[in-house]
């Protein structure tokens, strides 16, 4: 078998782009909480001392946007100018208009209803935009996620945990992780390299304090957790690089501007699967960029959980204002246990991929999105993450004749 290295990265909740994602989704949640039919497209730009929120919203709800922005920044941990940003004193600028009526007419009354006269209630809502979305699953981890992004997210989450609980009190909110795994064919066999970069206080020695603390309190506990989860991976002699550029005192929005939607590979599968290009945060579920990508994860995960394939990638495509998808494609990378066309037919039979049906089946009109905005939208089996359920396994197996 051919050996290869594959790398994925993650970032902490204090990374500037992730701050922007979390702000956008916090605003979305506030609007959905009061008006579940809210149409929301909110973008956030954050830079030194300033947050700018812009977008289009149609809603009956009221949200104190400036206060929501400040509260989220403080919750993340930026509460002092010494850390490069202070949510209590930063400027907040808001420029929000209403959704274009040209877009609204296609979402409110789909092509099937408007032109073809279809009376099906689920055909009344059209896709909020054209586009293509991918979902992916693989059996290399218990959550059916690729191992490199799975471990990278676990490391970045723990990096924030040890900062917040005081285990490593001199850490600051901004941070990144990166994991390189060696594969033998399609099987993950060895951990090659871990990179951890974390913002820190000014009086810290990297070699005698930061690097040993990161190894002891961040990396090693997560490697043990892999074993506890039944993941067999050779970790002896892996390379650990901690802050390889040197000191990392200036971080967060002072170090780099942040923008909603700039971490779409981190949000999904770490580069292991294809991506249609649409970001998630700040968008209500009428936007298929988000809801259909969640549905495709649901589909792919159920295919793998059903034992129909070891790896599965599913693509769906929509035309703006039309309810039915214009395309569905399934790739199993030679791992299918039944004929590939049977899997595609089973998906079309078992899953209704019209936007209104996705919203109904995954219960997406709830204020659940702020918790998706850091550490990955997929692979975290939280109660609100309905797209992580494997509730269509039996139906898929029946549909293919197993």
UniProtKB/Swiss-Prot annotation:
Residues the record lists as binding Mg(2+): 17
| Signal peptide segment | none
- Residues that hold ATP according to the record: 15, 174-176, 247-248, 256, 262-263, 279, 283
Q: Where in the cell is it found?
A: Cytoplasm
Q: How does it assemble?
A: Homotetramer; dimer of dimers.
**Known HAMAP family for this protein?**
S_AdoMet_synth1
Q: What is this protein called?
A: S-adenosylmethionine synthase
Origin species: Streptomyces avermitilis (strain ATCC 31267 / DSM 46492 / JCM 5070 / NBRC 14893 / NCIMB 12804 / NRRL 8165 / MA-4680)
Query: What phylogenetic lineage does the species belong to?
Result: Bacteria, Bacillati, Actinomycetota, Actinomycetes, Kitasatosporales
């Amino acid at each position: 078998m051919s050996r290869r290295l594959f790398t994925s990265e993650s970032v902490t909740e204090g990374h500037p782009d992730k701050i922007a994602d979390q702000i956008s989704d916090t605003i979305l949640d506030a609007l959905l909480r009061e008006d579940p039919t809210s149409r929301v497209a909110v973008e956030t730009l954050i830079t030194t001392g300033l947050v700018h929120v812009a977008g289009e919203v149609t809603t009956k709800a009221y949200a104190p946007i400036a206060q929501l922005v400040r509260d989220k920044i403080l919750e993340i941990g930026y509460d002092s100018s010494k850390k490069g940003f202070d949510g209590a004193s930063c400027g907040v600028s808001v420029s929000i208009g209403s959704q274009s009526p040209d877009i609204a007419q296609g979402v409110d009354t789909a092509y099937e209803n408007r032109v073809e006269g279809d009376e099906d209630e689920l055909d009344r809502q059209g896709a909020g935009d054209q586009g293509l979305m991918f979902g992916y699953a693989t059996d290399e981890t218990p959550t059916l996620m690729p191992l490199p992004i799975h471990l990278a997210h676990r490391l970045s989450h723990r990096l924030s945990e040890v900062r917040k609980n005081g285990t490593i009190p001199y850490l600051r909110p901004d941070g990144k992780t990166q994991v390189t795994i060696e594969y033998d064919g399609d099987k993950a066999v060895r951990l090659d390299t871990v990179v951890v970069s974390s913002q820190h206080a000014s009086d810290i020695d990297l070699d005698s304090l930061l690097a040993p603390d990161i190894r002891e309190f961040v990396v090693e506990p997560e490697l043990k957790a892999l074993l506890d989860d039944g993941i067999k991976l050779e970790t002896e002699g892996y390379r650990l690089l901690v802050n390889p550029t040197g000191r990392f005192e200036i971080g967060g929005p002072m170090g780099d501007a942040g923008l909603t939607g700039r971490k779409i590979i981190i949000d999904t599968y770490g580069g292991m699967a294809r991506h249609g290009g649409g970001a998630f945060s700040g968008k209500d579920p009428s936007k298929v960029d988000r809801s259909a990508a969640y549905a495709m994860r649901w589909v792919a995960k159920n295919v793998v959980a059903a034992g129909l394939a070891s790896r599965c990638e599913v693509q769906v495509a929509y035309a703006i204002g039309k309810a039915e998808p214009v395309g569905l494609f399934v790739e199993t990378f030679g791992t299918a246990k039944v004929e590939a066309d049977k899997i595609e037919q089973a998906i079309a039979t078992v899953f209704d991929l019209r936007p209104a049906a996705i919203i109904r089946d995954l219960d997406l009109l709830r204020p659940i999105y702020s918790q998706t905005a850091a550490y990955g939208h997929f692979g975290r089996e939280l109660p609100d993450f309905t797209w992580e359920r494997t509730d269509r396994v039996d139906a898929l197996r029946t549909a293919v004749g197993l």
